[in-house]
Structures are given as structure tokens and as C-alpha cells.
From Swiss-Prot:
PANTHER family: LUNG SEVEN TRANSMEMBRANE RECEPTOR, PROTEIN GPR108. Glycans are attached at N57, N109, N200, N204, N228, N534. It holds the Pfam family GOST_TM. Keywords: Glycoprotein, Golgi apparatus, Host-virus interaction, Membrane, Signal, Transmembrane, Transmembrane helix. This is Protein GPR108. The keyword Amino-acid biosynthesis does not apply.
Amino acid sequence: MAVSERRGLGRGSPAEWGQRLLLVLLLGGCSGRIHQLALTGEKRADIQLNSFGFYTNGSLEVELSVLRLGLREAEEKSLLVGFSLSRVRSGRVRSYSTRDFQDCPLQKNSSSFLVLFLINTKDLQVQVRKYGEQKTLFIFPGLLPEAPSKPGLPKPQATVPRKVDGGGTSAASKPKSTPAVIQGPSGKDKDLVLGLSHLNNSYNFSFHVVIGSQAEEGQYSLNFHNCNNSVPGKEHPFDITVMIREKNPDGFLSAAEMPLFKLYMVMSACFLAAGIFWVSILCRNTYSVFKIHWLMAALAFTKSISLLFHSINYYFINSQGHPIEGLAVMYYIAHLLKGALLFITIALIGSGWAFIKYVLSDKEKKVFGIVIPMQVLANVAYIIIESREEGASDYVLWKEILFLVDLICCGAILFPVVWSIRHLQDASGTDGKVAVNLAKLKLFRHYYVMVICYVYFTRIIAILLQVAVPFQWQWLYQLLVEGSTLAFFVLTGYKFQPTGNNPYLQLPQEDEEDVQMEQVMTDSGFREGLSKVNKTASGRELL
């Protein structure tokens, strides 16, 4: 069973579930770009530890503090375990879930960019093998010295020199890594050997990588492999604890995440301005305002607050490596409310609630009974994903749950719009109000197209963009999502603004006799020079 320091939900009573969800929210603030992953009883052959976009002079530090293989000493000496560091394409992380069980990544001779860290438990050393063009990718033993906490204090010296002969270790105390360099025929460093410590039936070592030039910049994926667990049914559980610290010259954020602080701050201001403008419209047209209009205002302000907290979180992650706990909790709460309000508002507008009717049908109530719990589940999945490490055993499961639930919600909110369109189509041919119903029908058809475009741009086009652009431009994915959301909000407000000439306010209130009398009076010229009075859905007259 794999466990992480950032736990999710488990079994228990509803009260315990609530407590654990709150615990997840609180611990979510601890996640950042300094990662600590602890797995016990793990049986996976390949563990995707993390991915990160590095610029020149960026650094990756890895400290394997615990590795217990759970086998006899003779069996451990023949194991094939280690790390791999590869440069992957933008928008994706290498997956080993479908590979052949006889194909071990640690035994590959690759012409592409790849670094292998082969753990040799027999000789107590870690052999580093490089493949591809890596002229300025520097690998050193130990961790980088920490910066002084106060100005004027001297920096602590590294406890391990970068190149030292020897590789033996002592089991009496925790020894330092002692690397050795083997020279190749050309005189260049071909294989770097790091010292491996063995203490209390556990192995440990550390290293750090520095990106030396622009040629080595890119999206890197760090993975752990235990090739002896590749054969199904013959897995042996092992324990591993690893610390990963990633940093770019300007902070702890990945290359694609650096612009997000400013992006989310600007978008938060845009949604705030849109919300204030919308409230001003409602205050000027109080006679035509429905409850759904105030719900739309609440959604705009909630979205703005959510983006504000998200922006602040990224600022502290970039400067400290982790966000502030209180702000992280506030962000998760705002995000949960925003997600629920968004789909509820879209579904209510699509059903025509308060616009063309005051009571939801049984079918529409069932849709809300599906969308609301699904949105709660989607937000719980999002919080768990944000608060757990990529290497956690259930990380991929929660990502799949989030994708599936979000897809179901996007499909479900279209049904009320379709039903409203059909209702107006049927009504236009039966109640004699063809002109009014056709105007409403056109309005809801436009809204249907808007919802389709919103889902298409934020779910499909955004993913394609993320795959297509280089690693440093991955933030365009968030720009497209937030920009599409803002455009959808503005267009929805424009289409359903509380003005007297809006089609949804022109609800027919007259019966058939009134229509006939109106026709007679018009034909006779009796009403010449008089203006027509329409009644709104609220029963109030608009001149």
C-alpha cells in the first residue's frame, strides 16, 4: 500500500470524511515545488516522481533518504533499480503504464536526451549514464548548499566535494557520498559514480543537476524504476522516501508557471470589473431583475476571488517553494464555490428558470441532482490532485476521475438548453405567439452555441494548445481557459441583461380573446397613436 505525506480521503463515517477533507485542504497549503514523497509497500515498477520546466542555471536536487527493498541480501545484489531523468515533449509526461514487462527503461541505450542513475547495491555505488547531446548538463553528488538566512552570514560549505576519488561507505554511521569519475577514451567524463550509503537495511544517496546552457533547457521528467517488479504477479513491496527540490534562477516555479502570477492577477481584476459593471446594470434596471441575475453577479465575484488567491499562492510558491496555508485554504474554498456556482448558473439559464418559467421540470431536477454532486466530486478530486505528489499511487486515478466527472458535467448542462429550445419550438406553433417565441428560440439557440464553444475552447482546444506549444509557453493554456471563461461570462450577461427589449422579458400574458380584440382594434384604427404595454415575467408592466 502506497502512502504519501499528503493524504486524501479514505474510509470512515461522514463526519470522518468531512474531517479528512478539511485536513486535505489544510495540508494542500504544504504542497509546492519542494516535494517530499514517502511510499510504503509500493509494488509499481515505474513511478513518475515529478516533471518540471528548467531554464539555464536551473537546478534539480534529489535526496533518496530511504530505500528498503524488502529482500534477502543476496537477492538485493542482483536487483535493477534506479532513477531516470529525461527531457520530454511539451504538454505530456512519459508514461510507462503500457510498456512491455521485459522492457526495462534502465537497460535502454537511447540516442535521445536521457540520464540514468543505476543503483548498484552490491558495490554500494550509483552509476550515472548519459545519452544524447548533453554538453552542459552538470551532475554533482550531494545537495546544493543552502543560502544564508540573513544578509552578511557566510554560506554553509558543501559537505561533499564535487569530484573526489573513492566510493566506499561505512555502515556504522551515515557516510557522505563519495563520487569517482571514470575517463572515457576521448578524455571526457563518460560515467560519474556516486557513493551509496547502506544503513539499517536502507540505502540512501543524493545528487543535484544544473542546467548549464540554453541547449539543455526544456521540460524534464524524473522517474524511479524497479525493473524486478515488471513481471505481473511477481512484485515485491518496497519502501522509498525521496525529497525533490526544483528551482529556476527566478524562483521555484516551473518555466511554464512563472507568468501565472501576473496572469491570474490581471484576470482577477477583469472578472472583478465585469462583476462591478454587471451590478451597476442590475441597479439601473431593478424593475427587470431576477434572482438569476444576482446569481450571475455572485459567480463573477467568486471567480475573481478564486483567481486572486491562486495568484497569491503562486507568488509564495515562487519565492518560498510552498504557499501560505491560510491562503491555500481560502483558494480551495473559493475554487469549490466557483465550480459549483458556474455549472448551476449555466444549467439554470439553460433551463429558462425565471426567464420563461418558474418551476423546473422533473427532468431538469434530475440534471441538477447529477451536476451538483458531480461538481462536488470534481472539486474534491482537484483539491486532492493539488495537494498530493505526482508519485503517489492514487494520483493518476484522481486525475482520471476529475477528467471523467468534468466531461459528464459539461455534457449534462447541455440538456436543459436543448429542452428549452424544444419547448419554445413546440410553443411557437400552438399558442399563437409565433413572433415572441421565435425571438426567445433564437436567444436560447445562441446560448446553446455559446455553451458548446465554451466547453470546446476550455477543454479541447486548450489541451491541443498545451501539447503544441513549447515548454516555456505552456501558460498559454491557462490564458486561453481564463480568456474563454471571461468571454463566456460577458456574452451571457449581454444576452440575458435585464432590459425591457430583451426577448425573454416579452412573455405573452394575454389569452386568445385579447389577441383577437387587439387585432380588431388595430384594424379599425381605434388604437392609432397609442403605445403597446408588455408585461414582464414578474408581472410588472414595462412601457
